[in-house]
A protein has these predicted regions:
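N-terminal hydrophobic/helix-forming segments and targeting peptides
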Residues: 1-170
């Protein structure tokens, strides 16, 4: 699990206290979703070439995608593809916490390559949703020289997005 591994590494630098909150718990106006784990995901053409590969970018899979192992033509796959038409090599970020679905986020050029593919496409998402899982949260209190307190809140749950994630911790 990438989040827990990140926290383990950060614990080497900062004395973090880790707390677990069970999936399904209501926190104010939010419900903690099931714990999601992904091991691999790809779209291969009929020749066996991986056109889209989770191992090249973890943004390629819609976060919280359900597991799938399918053979589809492009027309059937199209509703599960997300791209930004005006941006050739940009991979969009999508998630589906509360709606059971699956999908891939692809560059425009990958989309066009899939569209040109002849024959069936092989779609695999090796993932799991665990209703009995949990969300790990870290906290740390750094004593200051006055009685004033400041709360700094940050997160890193959206993969590979430096502008709004791990950069906030650093």
């Amino acid at each position: 699990d990438g989040n827990r591994e990140t926290l383990r590494i950060l614990q080497e630098l900062v004395p973090l206290e880790l707390n677990e909150y069970p999936s399904g718990s209501a926190i104010y106006d939010w419900v903690i979703p099931p714990e999601w784990t992904i091991r691999d995901a790809y779209i291969k053409n009929a020749s066996g070439d991986r056109i889209v590969d989770f191992n090249e970018s973890n943004l390629h899979v819609v976060s919280y995608s359900t597991p799938v192992d399918l053979q589809l033509d492009f027309a059937s796959l199209r509703p599960h593809l997300h791209t930004i038409e005006s941006e050739g090599e940009v991979i969009p970020y999508r998630t589906t916490y509360y709606k059971r679905d699956w999908g891939f986020c692809v560059t425009r050029s990958q989309y066009e390559q899939l569209e040109r593919s002849e024959g069936e496409l092989f779609i695999k998402i090796d993932s799991a949703l665990n209703e009995g899982g949990s969300m790990t949260v870290a906290e740390c209190c750094v004593p200051g020289e006055t009685s004033e307190e400041y709360l700094v809140s940050t997160y890193f749950c959206h993969p590979s997005m430096a502008n709004d994630n791990l950069s906030g911790l650093l």
